[in-house]
Regions:
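Ser/Thr- (and often Asn-) enriched beta-sheet segments in non-cytosolic proteins
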Residues: 3, 24, 86-88, 117-119, ...
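Gram-negative (and chloroplast) outer-membrane scaffold detector with strong preference
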Residues: 24-104, 108
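Short glycine/proline- and aromatic-enriched beta-strand/turn motifs that initiate or cap beta-hairpins
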Residues: 1-45, 127, 135-139
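Predominantly the C-terminal beta-signal and adjacent terminal strand-loop region
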Residues: 15, 33, 94-139
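Small-side-chain structural scaffolding
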Residues: 5, 20, 72, 89-91, ...
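Short hydrophobic/aromatic beta-strand or adjacent loop that forms the aromatic wall/cage
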Residues: 18, 50-54, 127-131
Length: 139
């Protein structure tokens, strides 16, 4: 499955917000037990750019033929450039994921994914975010 959408993040440590697009691919190695999602998100704010790549391990639950909910956790690599200072850091992320499909064939739908992130790098930044957008099922 392919996820294409937008993302917003708010640093709880620095009290600043960032916005940008997001793209992720999700596969199901163990039906009804495990889904893996790898995604990339560039976030922008004045004088700062942050690129993140995450790998989430998700447990899915089917609520109906057209609704699913998942909880995921995983590592994240972050490259940031703020005021010319470049930095790499590692973070941990936890996300609930809500999916709504247009039909039970799961070809097209939309998703909403709130998140909490903790950076293990300098400053130990905490942030909350939300992403949402279009789901495209890949047969």
């Amino acid at each position: 499955m392919l996820e294409i959408g937008g993302a917003a993040s708010r640093s709880l440590t620095e009290s600043q917000s960032s916005f940008g697009p997001t793209l992720a691919v999700e596969v199901t190695p163990i039906e009804k037990w495990l889904e893996l999602e790898i995604g990339v998100t560039p976030l922008f704010r004045p004088h700062s750019t942050e690129w993140s790549v995450d790998l989430l391990f998700k447990k899915p639950w089917t609520l109906s033929d057209t609704k699913e909910v998942m909880i995921g956790i995983g590592p994240e690599w972050i490259y940031s450039n703020a005021y010319g200072i470049k930095m790499n850091s590692v973070a941990g992320e936890i996300v609930p994921d809500f999916m709504f499909w247009s039909s039970k064939k799961h070809r097209f739908g939309w998703y909403l994914e709130p998140s909490y992130e903790y950076k293990f790098g300098p400053g130990h930044e905490h942030s909350i975010g939300i992403s949402g957008g279009l789901l495209i099922g890949i047969p």
